[in-house]
């Protein structure tokens, strides 16, 4: 894996959940919202791709009868996958299976509400941890939103999987072997300013006129100079963004430009650098190295750096099935 940052993958969800809790603070005594025989959903998975919990591979067998037997043995293993992780609030995580697809869940009795942004962040990070663990066992999952809960126990989840089987299976097949990557593009404006001041004839002319003018006119010329410099910097930022998109587009399936957002402690901007843009891309696992090599070409430019994180489950691109 390339560099991973928990903050970058959960930033949007954390902000959204924190905003929801801020609204709840207006109530003097917020009531805990309970659920009846609830099942908290982390993600949906393809149970036919589960790795054996013993790590052994089944030997290939010829003939339809032997293939059927191998399939039965694999299904038996899927039901006993040993999760080496815990879920939100230290709950035990398990899989509810249904017709080649499944849901990663834990039993719950309440909605996860709190007035503490830090607690929300920890819940969301734990949610992500479970989804990541599922991806190691079952391949690319379909992540569910934080706080997605079904009432009615395992039976209700099994029924939901049955009713939505074709859609879930189709989406899992579509995302199989693909992962989400986050690309943050930074630059040092001071490096560009020093370069452009030596190359831009208009800036040089305005600078010379300032030096020769009186204080009043010099002030106006300074404003013109600053405006010209801002325009050149804005144009350069746009050029870098376009270059980044054109560089990665040939080797990714999907590309989405993301807002600046607030930076978490795990996802901070490098000192003295400004974030130009950030992208989320969906790419085949086999293209990860090629994608990284293409990004290296951009980094070769003066004052430019890139933070490349992943692979993640497709948080940005997965459909809303909750």
Curated annotation (Swiss-Prot):
Induction: Transcribed from early-log phase, decreases as cells enter stationary phase, probably as a long gvpF-gvpM RNA. Highly expressed in 25% salt, poorly expressed in 15% salt, no gas vesicles are formed at 15% salt. It is found in: Gas vesicle. One of its GO terms (cellular component) is gas vesicle. NCBIfam families: gas_vesic_GvpL (NF045778). Residues 45-57, 73-85 have a biased composition (Polar residues). This is Gas vesicle protein L. Keywords: Gas vesicle. The lineage of its organism: Archaea, Methanobacteriati, Methanobacteriota, Stenosarchaea group, Halobacteria. It comes from Haloferax mediterranei (strain ATCC 33500 / DSM 1411 / JCM 8866 / NBRC 14739 / NCIMB 2177 / R-4).
């Amino acid at each position: 894996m390339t560099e991973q940052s928990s903050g970058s993958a959960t930033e949007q969800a954390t902000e959204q959940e924190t905003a929801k809790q801020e609204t709840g603070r207006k109530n003097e005594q917020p009531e805990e919202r309970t659920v009846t025989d609830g099942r908290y959903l982390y993600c949906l998975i393809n149970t036919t791709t589960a790795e054996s919990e013993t790590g052994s591979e089944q030997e290939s067998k010829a003939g339809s009868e032997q293939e059927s037997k191998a399939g039965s043995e694999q299904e038996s293993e899927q039901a006993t996958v040993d999760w080496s992780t815990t879920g939100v609030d230290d709950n035990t995580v398990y899989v509810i299976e249904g017709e080649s697809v499944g849901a990663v869940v834990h039993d719950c009795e309440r909605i996860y509400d709190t007035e503490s942004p830090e607690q929300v962040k920890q819940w969301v990070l734990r949610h992500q941890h479970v989804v990541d663990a599922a991806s190691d066992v079952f391949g690319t999952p379909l992540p569910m939103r934080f706080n997605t809960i079904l009432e009615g126990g395992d039976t209700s989840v099994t029924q939901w999987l049955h009713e939505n089987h074709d859609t879930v299976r189709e989406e899992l097949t579509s995302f199989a072997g693909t992962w989400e990557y986050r690309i943050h593009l930074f630059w040092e404006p001071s490096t560009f300013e020093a370069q452009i001041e030596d190359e831009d004839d208009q800036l040089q002319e305005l600078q010379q006129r300032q030096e020769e003018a009186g204080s009043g006119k010099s002030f106006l010329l300074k404003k013109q100079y600053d405006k010209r410099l801002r325009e050149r910097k804005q144009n350069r930022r746009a050029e870098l963004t376009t270059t980044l998109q054109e560089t990665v587009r040939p080797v990714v399936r999907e590309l989405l430009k993301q807002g600046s957002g607030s930076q978490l402690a795990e996802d901070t901007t490098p000192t003295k650098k400004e974030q130009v843009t950030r992208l989320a891309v969906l790419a085949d696992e086999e293209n990860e190295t090629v994608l990284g090599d293409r990004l290296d070409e951009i980094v070769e430019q003066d004052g430019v750096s890139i933070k490349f994180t992943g692979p993640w489950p497709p948080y940005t691109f997965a459909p809303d099935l909750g």
